[in-house]
C-alpha cells in the first residue's frame, strides 16, 4: 500500500512520546508498504534528522509553519472556537500545500497522528486513520485542577478539546489510541470503536547486560520540560528523599532527560541529587540507577520510560495511574504505590531484599518482552488499515 503518514512534529530525534511512536510505526510499516512522510514543523529540521527518516520513506516533506503568523492564526482559531492545541499547529496556507501534496501522491491510506494535525487532512477523499494517542482534553483538565490562577482558561481549553475530539471522529475511517485507560477518558459515544494500540519497546536495544555498577540508588528519566515529569522529579527530591533520610537512608538520586528548566535544575543543590539533563545515550542513565522511581499522578498515555526501565531489568516503583496503562501485575512485575509512605516502603523493600530485587527485575523484563513488542503493535495497525474495517469491540 501507498501510505501517507502525517505528523505535527518531525519524528526524529525520538526524545518525545509522539515522535517515538511515529518513528517506529513508520520504520515497521515501511518493510511492507510505501511510506510518504508529511511533517508539520515550527522549526527547521537538521540534515541528520532528515537522513534518519529517509531509509524508511519514499518521500519526506516538511511543511514549516510561519512563526510570524502564529499570533494571528491562534487568534483566528480561538475566535472560531478551535482549541489552542489545534490552532497553534494549523497554518491555513500550509494546509492547502499539504492537501495538494497528498492528493498528488494518491495514497491508498493516510495516517494522521494526533488531533493537532487532523485539520490538514480531515477533508481529503482518501481512507484515513486518526491516532488520538493521548486524550488532550483530559490533560488540559488536569492542568485546570493544578493551576488555580489560570483554572478558567484551562477549563475552557479542556471543553474545546473535548468537543474537537468528538467532532473530528466522523472525518476518519479508523481510530486508534495508546491505552484502554485513555480511551475511557474520551468524552464521546463512539469510543468503544477506537482500537487500543500501545507503544512497543525494542528489548534488544533496551537491555542491561550488567556490565556497569550503578552509582545511584534511585533514577528518574524523562522529558524534563513536560509538566508531569517536572512534578515527578520535584516530588522525588522534596518528598521522598527527606522521608528516606528520616529512616537514616541517605540515597543518591539521578534525574536525567532533555530540557530541564530552572525548577528542575535547582534540585542539583540538594545533597545526593544529580540532575544530568540531556544524555546522549539515555540507556546510561538507566544503567546508573538501582531502582526506577516514577510517582506520577498526572499525565496521559503510556509511559515509555517505565517500559524501557523494565526492559533493562530495572525494578520500578510507580503509581496506579501509570500502571493502569501498562497492565503489569503489582508485586510481581512492578511495585505500585500512591502515597509517600507506600512509595518509601517499596523502595526499602527493593534495597533490603536482593532476592526480591532480582525476581522483579527479571519478571519486569519478561513482561515487557511478551506484551510490548513494536512489531506486534504495528502489525495491529497494519491489519486495521488493510482490512479497511472500523474496529469492532470484542
Predicted features by range, described:
Residues 8, 67, 71-88, 128-167, ...:
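Acceptor-binding helix/loop patch of EC 2.4 sugar-transfer enzymes
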Residues 173, 287-301, 312-315:
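Acidic donor-binding loop of glycosyltransferase active sites
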Residues 1-62:
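N-terminal subdomain of nucleotide-sugar transferases
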Amino acid at each position: 500500500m501507498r501510505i501517507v503518514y502525517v505528523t505535527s512534529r518531525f519524528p526524529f530525534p525520538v526524545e518525545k512520546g509522539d515522535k517515538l511512536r511515529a518513528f517506529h510505526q513508520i520504520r515497521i510499516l515501511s518493510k511492507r508498504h510505501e511510506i510518504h512522510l508529511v511533517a508539520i514543523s515550527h522549526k527547521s529540521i537538521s540534515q541528520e534528522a532528515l537522513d534518519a527518516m529517509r531509509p524508511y520513506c519514499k518521500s519526506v516533506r516538511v511543511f514549516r509553519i510561519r512563526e510570524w503568523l502564529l499570533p494571528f492564526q491562534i487568534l483566528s482559531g480561538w475566535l472560531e472556537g478551535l482549541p489552542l492545541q489545534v490552532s497553534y499547529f494549523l497554518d491555513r496556507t500550509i494546509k492547502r500545500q499539504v492537501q495538494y501534496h497528498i492528493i498528488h501522491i494518491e495514497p491508498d491510506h493516510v495516517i494522521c497522528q494526533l488531533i493537532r494535525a487532523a485539520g490538514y487532512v480531515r477533508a481529503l477523499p482518501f481512507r484515513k486513520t486518526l491516532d488520538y494517542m493521548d486524550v488532550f482534553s483530559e490533560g488540559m483538565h488536569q492542568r485546570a485542577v493544578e493551576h488555580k490562577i489560570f483554572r478558567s482558561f484551562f477549563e475552557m481549553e479542556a471543553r474545546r478539546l473535548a468537543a474537537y475530539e468528538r467532532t473530528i471522529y466522523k472525518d476518519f475511517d479508523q481510530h486508534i489510541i495508546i491505552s484502554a485507560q485513555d480511551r475511557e477518558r474520551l468524552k464521546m459515544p463512539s469510543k468503544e470503536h477506537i482500537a487500543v494500540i500501545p507503544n512497543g519497546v525494542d528489548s534488544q536495544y533496551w537491555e542491561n547486560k550488567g556490565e556497569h555498577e550503578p552509582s545511584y540508588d534511585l533514577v528518574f528519566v524523562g522529558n524534563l520540560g513536560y509538566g508531569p515529569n517536572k512534578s515527578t522529579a520535584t516530588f522525588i527530591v522534596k518528598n521522598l528523599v527527606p522521608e528516606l533520610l528520616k529512616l537514616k537512608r541517605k540515597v543518591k538520586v539521578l534525574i536525567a532527560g532533555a530540557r530541564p528548566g530552572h525548577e528542575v535544575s535547582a534540585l542539583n543543590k540538594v545533597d545526593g541529587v544529580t540532575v544530568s539533563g540531556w544524555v546522549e545515550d539515555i540507556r546510561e542513565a538507566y544503567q546508573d540507577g538501582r531502582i526506577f522511581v516514577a510517582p506520577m499522578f498526572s499525565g496521559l498515555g503510556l509511559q515509555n520510560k517505565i517500559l524501557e526501565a523494565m526492559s533493562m531489568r530495572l525494578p520500578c516503583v510507580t503509581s496506579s495511574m501509570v500502571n493502569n496503562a501498562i497492565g503489569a501485575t503489582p508485586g510481581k512485575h512492578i511495585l505500585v504505590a500512591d502515597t509517600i509512605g507506600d512509595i518509601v516502603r517499596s523502595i526499602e523493600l527493593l534495597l533490603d531484599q536482593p532476592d526480591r530485587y532480582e525476581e522483579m527485575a527479571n519478571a519486569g523484563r519478561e513482561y515487557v518482552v511478551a506484551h510490548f513488542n513494536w512489531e506486534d503493535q504495528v502489525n495491529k495497525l497494519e491489519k486495521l488499515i488493510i482490512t479497511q474495517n472500523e474496529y469492532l469491540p470484542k
